[in-house]
């Protein structure tokens, strides 16, 4: 198996112990019933993690949307991280990325028929989505990044674990990157190890299964990332596959994601001239950032250069008022999807659709 990317600062263990005590107490207050969890009379599926950084929540949420939207009216509820608005917001055709955040905006653009809403208070958000006057016809709700939001008790709780940062090898913040102890995984009905190498062996998967130490009631799946064709962000040109990129093309990879190293690693086999310009996750591009992007691009060989960015970053770049017109023809967006390994897709799909079918009823809440 590949080496992991985990770096633990042992000097911060005392602070992690204090932090862990607070997290333990909070979870116990829910376990003891002092803090109340609400169960809603509508299928609710939660997707989330117990670590900071990217585990692939958005592509897995989008997978669920694709799976369910052909038979059900799907609503997705997110916190709307770094949005400029407050409270409950239901996305409309003219809703901006600033109002709901980059990932919700991305999902609404890709799936215009879903109800896409943001609300920090997930219980309130679900109530609004169950209101036929606000979000007509809602039949199933997907909670994006809600594994630790325990005020809602979902029917299916999906925990995502990054293959490169296994929770069994990590530790609590700030020494590590875990937001709660590993035993928090016990709340999950389904655990998915994400970002697995495409060529991972059956033996490695068996080792991983043992390392995860799941309970008998839990299901374990493995997924990998797949990349679609590059789409021009501002022009009407044709999409281009990664294999079609000329070998002498020089690429400026502009990202504002949690783990750009994995993306660089995945793109390297297609081109050896990749320069990375990495910003923080959900980065709000400033005027200085836009100038830096242009400056770095102009240093690449003329006639042999392009800019590649992620879907999540593309929605912020496309809406940026200071985007240089000269750069627009050279910017391409790289879509990402997930694929299940070991022929697990059919089993996963049936488990999700069976749950939704058996629990579909009037969307009242209690």
Curated annotation (Swiss-Prot):
UniProt record, GO biological process: lipid A biosynthetic process; lipopolysaccharide core region biosynthetic process
Cellular component per GO, a single term: plasma membrane
Positions of ATP binding: 51-58
SUPFAM superfamilies named in the record: P-loop containing nucleoside triphosphate hydrolases
The protein's enzyme class: transferase
TM regions (residue ranges): none
Pathway(s) the chain acts in: Glycolipid biosynthesis; lipid IV(A) biosynthesis; lipid IV(A) from (3R)-3-hydroxytetradecanoyl-[acyl-carrier-protein] and UDP-N-acetyl-alpha-D-glucosamine: step 6/6
S-S bonds: none
GO terms for MF: ATP binding; tetraacyldisaccharide 4'-kinase activity
Record keywords, A-Z: ATP-binding, Kinase, Lipid A biosynthesis, Lipid biosynthesis, Lipid metabolism, Nucleotide-binding, Transferase
EC number: 2.7.1.130
Family designation: Belongs to the LpxK family.
Purpose: Transfers the gamma-phosphate of ATP to the 4'-position of a tetraacyldisaccharide 1-phosphate intermediate (termed DS-1-P) to form tetraacyldisaccharide 1,4'-bis-phosphate (lipid IVA).
Alphabetized NCBIfam families for the sequence: lpxK
HAMAP family documented for this protein: LpxK
PANTHER family for the chain: TETRAACYLDISACCHARIDE 4'-KINASE (PTHR42724), TETRAACYLDISACCHARIDE 4'-KINASE, MITOCHONDRIAL-RELATED (PTHR42724:SF1)
Protein name listed in UniProt: Tetraacyldisaccharide 4'-kinase
């Amino acid at each position: 198996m590949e080496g992991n990317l985990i770096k633990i600062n042992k000097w911060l263990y005392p602070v992690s112990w204090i932090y862990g005590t607070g997290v333990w107490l909070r979870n116990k207050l829910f376990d003891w019933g002092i803090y109340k969890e609400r169960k809603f009379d509508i299928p609710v599926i939660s997707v989330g993690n117990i670590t900071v950084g990217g585990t692939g929540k958005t592509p897995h949420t989008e997978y669920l949307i694709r799976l369910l939207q052909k038979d059900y009216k799907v609503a997705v509820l997110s916190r709307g991280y770094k949005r400029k608005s407050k409270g409950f917001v239901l996305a409309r055709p003219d809703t901006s990325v600033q109002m709901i955040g980059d990932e919700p905006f991305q999902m609404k653009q890709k799936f215009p028929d879903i109800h896409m809403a943001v609300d920090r208070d997930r219980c309130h958000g679900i109530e609004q989505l169950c209101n036929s006057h606000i979000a007509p016809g809602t039949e199933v709700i997907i909670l994006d990044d809600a594994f630790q939001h325990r005020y809602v008790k979902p029917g299916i709780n999906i925990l995502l674990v990054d293959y490169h940062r296994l929770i069994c090898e990590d530790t609590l913040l700030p020494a590590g990157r875990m937001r709660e102890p590993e035993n928090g995984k016990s709340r999950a009905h389904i655990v998915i190890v994400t970002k697995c190498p495409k060529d991972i062996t059956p033996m490695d998967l068996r080792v991983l299964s043992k390392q995860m130490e799941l309970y008998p009631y839990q299901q374990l799946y493995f997924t990998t990332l797949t990349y679609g064709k590059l789409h021009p962000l501002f022009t009407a040109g044709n999409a281009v596959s990664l294999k079609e990129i000329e070998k002498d093309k020089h690429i400026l990879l502009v990202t504002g994601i949690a783990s750009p190293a994995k993306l660089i690693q995945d793109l390297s086999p297609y081109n050896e001239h990749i320069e990375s310009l990495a910003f923080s996750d959900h980065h709000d591009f400033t005027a200085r950032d836009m100038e830096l992007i242009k400056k770095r691009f102009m240093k690449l060989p003329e006639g042999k250069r392009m800019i590649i960015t992620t879907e999540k970053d593309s929605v912020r770049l496309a809406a940026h008022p200071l985007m240089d017109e000269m750069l627009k023809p050279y910017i391409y967006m790289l879509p990402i999807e997930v694929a299940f390994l070991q022929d697990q897709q059919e089993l996963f799909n049936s488990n999700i659709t069976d749950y939704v079918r058996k629990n579909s009823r009037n969307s009242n809440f209690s």
